[in-house]
Amino acid sequence: MINPRFEKEAFKKEVEQNVKQLFRKTVDEVSQQELYQAVSYVVKDAIIDDWIATQKQYEKDDPKIVYYMSMEFLLGRALGNNLINMTAYKEVKEALEEMGLNLNELEDQEPDPALGNGGLGRLAACFLDSLASLGYAAYGCGIRYRYGMFKQKIKDGYQEEKPDNWLKNGNPFELRRPEYAKEVRFGGNIRVEYDDKTGDIRFKQENYESVLAVPYDYPIVGYDNHIVNTLRIWDAEPIVDFQLDSFDRGDYHKAVEQQNLAKTIVEVLYPNDNHYAGKELRLKQQYFFVSASLQAALEKYKKNHDDIHKLPEKMTIQMNDTHPTVAVAELMRLLLDEEGLGWDEAWEITTKTCAYTNHTIMAEALEIWPIDLFSRLLPRVYQIIQEIDRRFVAKIREMYPGNEEKVAKMQILRDGQVKMAHLAIVAGYSVNGVARLHTEILKKQELRDFYEMMPQKFNNKTNGITQRRFLMHGNPLLADWVTDKLGTKDWITDLSLMSGLKKWVDDEEALKEFMSIKYENKVRLAKYIKEHNGIEVDPRSIFDVQVKRLHEYKRQFLNILHVMYLYNEIKEHPEISFYPRTFIFGAKASAGYIRAKQIIKLINSVADVVNNDRSINGKLKVVFIEDYRVSNAEIIFAAADVSEQISTASKEASGTGNMKFMLNGAPTLGTMDGANVEIVEEVGAENAFIFGLSSDEVINYENNGGYNPMDIYNSDADIRRVVNQLVDGTYSQGDKEMYRDLYNSLLTAQGGSKADTYFILKDFRSYADTQKKVEEAYRDKDRWAKMALLNTASCGKFSSDRTIQEYVDDIWHLDKVTVEV
């Protein structure tokens, strides 16, 4: 993309010029951080040319635009990724080397943008990358968090949350766009005005407080096609800059009130909502970015179109999970109150414009809001939801006369709560799950009543990942090898071509090269672990990796209990041949999620004991990688031997880490859950390690009972010993109460939930047996190399390019745009 016009000498001059203008220094005098800034601004200049060209092309072609609304966008670092998509990485690296500079070191100066946390945000980032690379018009819409979720520090084994001040040196790739600022209003009351002549009714919000939503545009560079789409993240600023008169009168609190309101809205991602103030802040955040994004989208539409009724032909809103689903009612408000449409007209437009992606079957994540909070904070939006609910209930009663149980299950407003997923399903024209199993569970279980009433809305879109970041950028050695073996670079935009690697699966030399690349990546990760954890790990050991958000259903607890079991085995039977293992964890726990934080502490306590026991001769190592994020994830995925995907079956909607490991040649050790099911289909059961209950078995136990963990505890001495070690002081320096809650969670029902809610003990023996099979397979070097290569060769389905094309074909109906430069 930048290639045809890339000139080393011109690039070097621009870097020197930027150093001078930005810092009043020469290249010899600046810090690495300053050099990173200088280089980034040169790259941004090149991007802006294509950004402008893209916008001009969009104005000319007038394509339909998808607005992808998400609370999170977990982008990862931009410099290297942008250079890869501009096909300029190699040239820039060489130019910098000629200046005595190292591109990788400069990349390390860039903080990960703190705009997301887990798979939800990373999926959104992959989707934006694919939309731009495939040539579709799209805006990402989110919040410009000042501190993100948090920076994780591990102190004495405990997680500590520190502010992630990612913007302290500015963000060279963003553009502030104050000319597109929008007012967003909260609270107050609604005055109804009647027009006697026309009979029209108007609703006016009064006595509200408001903030100014100011957009920052972040370029999303398509691969080698000159297309640059936009991620628009909103900052909050006070409407009135500073009330000096209040300050002069001594009313300091009032003087900074506006400032504080704006500041708190964009301070952090997912403020702790264990209390009322946290809930209120979360709802404010959601409405803030949704309202601003919709106002901007309507303004953009009206600039070129006169007929508001044709809005669905030019715009679609994809709501990524339940966080942005207030968009349904806000779009209605804008159409009714600002555009002056009648209810039926507004509803017709809204229900052809909004689409909803469901990401979870965990009830806790299907958002609900207390009506008293919602109606006070968003009074007009609440009125609109009341009317949507009233009409929907009438429809249910018409279709299912006398079935009040159905009404109770499907209502949007029920038991003093606003059910956001219900709102999205009722008003959306599409409802999709994110893996085939997940979508089936939604249709048969969680959303069954909705599916029976409106089956045409439901569809599946199995998630995917971008190979450009997770292979090209994260694992350049393997990327070059793939290109060499396929004889083409076309896999970069068509991952299905990876199946061409299957012809090398019996080629001894090719397998050797493949495993040699894996070893080099393990050496790189071992170096990272030594630098950041002070732990020596052997790259010849099996790197068994579980990196993902910490949640009980993801069962990091099962993993570490198994490590405790292995440690017992090695201690008791030192004569047994045991292939050395390194168990690698990376995970953040939500600040208010106490049990998840206990599991982190347990992992670190086990690491302390195991890693410092010289008697086991380094056969077992445990590493907890601090502050897991996109930039260290790339290093981890490239180095993994085993991909731990061990969620309780039926609980993981899809997962995308499983796909990143697969792409990088790590076989899956997992349950038949989420996208694991489809991974096994693609690679073959013989090239994965599957264990545990099926989703049907889990659901059956949950609905009908019949599982008592005490039976397993009493009958299996190995399991009993491991569980008892939680409370006998083995891993807590004699403190028998430190892990009492974890112990109790396995054996006794508490607080309305059953004992061993996530079937850890039920699946333990199956998991341990399957881990033995992993060791057996790994000992057979030839067999393992074939398995690893077949995983990479079978990953073609799991590109986000494929996922996005399915969204385009089935939901969005967009046209491709070509930018000529």
Annotate the PLM regions.
Residues 1-821:
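A conserved ligand/cofactor-binding region detector
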